[in-house]
Amino acid sequence: RSTVPARTSTDGENFDDNRPQPRTARAADPETTEAAFRIAGKNLPEGEILNYVQSWIKEDKSTFLKNALERMDTPLAELADALQRFRHGGVEEGDLSTATQIGLRAALVRRFLTDQLEFVNIAKDYLTVADFHELCQRIVYPPRSHGRLGGKAAGLYLASKIVARSP
């Protein structure tokens, strides 16, 4: 039986064939940015451009939480810190795009509760980022823990939020 050696990056980091490679940051090109704003200025009212820029800034302020959730090796303590930072960062969940809201909720469900698709699909409609911040204040976990709540606890937590939000 032969094995294929793991691919490595130029800095020696191993890449699993079934995982995406890390994103590379692209520097902002001033000419492209100016051209985009010039075209927008010709086709959109100033107020609408300002609204778009403000929404992009708010989306950008949630990037650290998205990044923490995407890294599967992020300990629960760091996720709790990222949730705390998000809560006090001046951005409300409702300020974000619907896609970002749902993405954050689904990622939080997968990291704290379960990765069962049926559960995630239901939970993302009922649980909010604020719910997970509140949850972090109530659970006890070791500093480097990567675990989740048990199945019964996850189900009871979701059920309590569904009942609380029902008319």
Regions found by a protein language model. Give the residues of each.
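N-terminal beta-alpha lobe that positions the nucleotide/phosphoryl donor
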Residues: R1-P167
